[in-house]
Amino acid sequence: MASSSTLANDDWKQGLAAPPKDLRPQTEDVTATQGSRFEDFGLRRELLMGIYTAGFERPSPIQEQAIPMALTGRDILARAKNGTGKTASFIIPTLNRINTSLSHIQALILVPTRELALQTSQVCKTLGAHIPNLQVMITTGGTTLRDDILRLQQPVHILVGTPGRILDLGSKGIAGLNKCGIFVMDEADKLLSEDFMPVIEQTLALCPQERQVMLFSATFPWTVKEFKDQHMVQPYEINLMDELTLKGVTQYYAYVEESQKVHCLNTLFSKLQINQSIIFCNSTNRVELLAKKVTELGYSCFYSHAKMQQAHRNRVFHDFRNGMTRNLVCSDLLTRGIDIQAVNVVINFDFPRTAESYLHRIGRSGRFGHLGLAISLLTLEDRHNLYRIESELGTEIAPIPAVIDPVLYVAPAMVEEERESPPPKPAAIAAPPAQQQPQQRQRQHPPVPSHQVAHHSPAAAPIQQQQQQQQQQQQPQYQLAYGQGPPQPQVPFQQANSSPAPAPLPSYPQQAPTQAQGPAQMQSPPSEPATQPQASAQIPVQGQTPPIQPRAQQQGQQQPSQPGQAEGQSQPNRRPNTGGFRGNGRGQGHRGRGRGRGGQPGHPGAGASQSQQAQA
């Protein structure tokens, strides 16, 4: 009798295509539950169908506590780690309470960034795909107001957006919020900061007094307590932050000079088994410069920051989620709420300034209890921030070891597959006579450094073939379009990571080198030959004076003087200063132009010599 009842309850699963199960191990951040199921919450059948097709098997700890209380209509103040399922904790009860027979806005979800709004609206549509006539709308800054006005003339049940655009539409009467009974704030600590607090209070005033307010975040500053006392009624508080950082994320730091950061990043790319990676910089200018350097190294990457056009930002975010590239260079724009399951490595190219920023950055890896790796590149000036962040977060960031075991950030099944696959046997490739002469000419060029090609062919492919492939990769240079590098083949990341030997280059000229296999041997950066410009490539720090070039290079870069040229600028065809004598005001020696420090041979000065005054 019980079995027939269970079968009847599971009839709704027939005909639904469930996604393949994720066999990767999970940490206690998402597995330490009481054994509840989504069917135990009394959700509507259409919503259960959406949860099943989305691949949600069992609720996480935050979902297990938040969903039942949210279904009762009570205010909720929830604090949980990044990547533990906070988004579904408020979307599932919100969808369950929506009445699609009504045409007005019934739920308002506020998020701090446009990318997070795009992701949240997509989750609403995915989980509510089987709810008939459900209408979800997203509105953010950077889009035309006319399109939003036309869209709001049609029925909208859930409105997702950023605070500024929501207040603009609500204050003008375009978006009717007077019947909105559910008010949700994701990443509430950011929304309740000084930048958003006045906008939030004005928007909340447009909603009715009988409303449900739900706040979700990983960190709660003192401003949250003030908001709770003023606008929430006996909220149900949930705190699952026994520790701030995720248990599945391994954290390392490495001390490097600013001029060697690009070279260190290249070494990490070649040694780590990267599925997808996010690289963070502290300024928009450095984001674009680093993305160009990564592309020049032969790796495909996108970049994104707040100064880009909204259409480009949406396209970058969409393509990166769909696996169009492995690497994304960005600012702190994508530190909050962005959920990309394939990201297993986060690199802080610039060390964050605050503990809050560091916490949200490393939370982009190890999503939903999976394994991840966070590596920070530090200069000597960053060591004080390192100690402060460690003390504030109560965590320990270890120095990067000589060997990084892939078990720490790669799924065990993939690691075992890599170890069990035998290395390919070397094969002698006989080139046709027409190709013999070009190979002879290639031998005259300096050989490719060993640290660049060692990870490509551990099984001993011919050296000439390796050099030829390296030169073919370095010949063309792509012009970045919104951060996009050379295209990559559409293959699963698991297959791409397990490539045992270098394959012939495809039709496009550049391709990201295959990630290394086995444990990563981290070595100190070797001395660079003159033929490798990227090793010494330096991205200027914002606000820092560029390094002074030698005088010989300055003269080679001088431009002919133009009429109206400012006094003191370089003149064309000027002979170098051969000597100067110490003077008390104006240089007296041959070509001497020094004031005070012109006494040693070869020291240029700042004053004009008498001969130059006579010519003037």
Swiss-Prot record:
Catalysis: reaction(s): ATP + H2O = ADP + phosphate + H(+)
Gene Ontology CC terms: P-body
EC number, as in UniProt: 3.6.4.13
Helicase ATP-binding domain ranges (all copies): 67-238
Keyword Cytoplasm: yes
Gene3D superfamilies: P-loop containing nucleotide triphosphate hydrolases
Motif segment (DEAD box): 186-189
Annotated region (Disordered), positions in chain: 1-35, 416-616
Single GO MF descriptor: ATP hydrolysis activity
Helicase C-terminal domain span: 248-408
PROSITE patterns attached to this UniProt entry: DEAD_ATP_HELICASE, HELICASE_ATP_BIND_1, HELICASE_CTER, Q_MOTIF
Motif, Q motif: chain positions: 36-64
Low complexity bias locations: 427-441, 458-500, 508-523, 550-579, 606-616
Chief place where the protein resides: cytoplasm
Keyword annotations of the record: ATP-binding, Cytoplasm, Helicase, Hydrolase, mRNA processing, mRNA transport, Nucleotide-binding, RNA-binding, Translation regulation, Transport
SMART domains linked to this entry: DEXDc (SM00487), HELICc (SM00490)
Cellular localization per UniProt: Cytoplasm, P-body
Example GO BP: regulation of translation
Disruption phenotype: Leads to an accumulation of autophagic bodies and increases autophagic flux accompanied by increased accumulation of ATG8 mRNA and protein in nutrient-replete conditions.
Biased composition (Polar residues): 529-545
Database matches in PANTHER family: DEAD-BOX ATP-DEPENDENT RNA HELICASE 50
Domain remarks: The Q motif is unique to and characteristic of the DEAD box family of RNA helicases and controls ATP binding and hydrolysis.
Family: Belongs to the DEAD box helicase family. DDX6/DHH1 subfamily.
Stated role: ATP-dependent RNA helicase involved in mRNA turnover, and more specifically in mRNA decapping. Is involved in G1/S DNA-damage checkpoint recovery, probably through the regulation of the translational status of a subset of mRNAs. May also have a role in translation and mRNA nuclear export. Blocks autophagy in nutrient-rich conditions by, at least partly, binding and repressing the expression of a set of ATG genes, including ATG3, ATG7, ATG8, ATG19, ATG20 and ATG22. VAD1-mediated repression of autophagy is regulated by TOR-dependent phosphorylation of the decapping enzyme DCP2.
Name of this chain's protein: ATP-dependent RNA helicase VAD1
Gene: VAD1
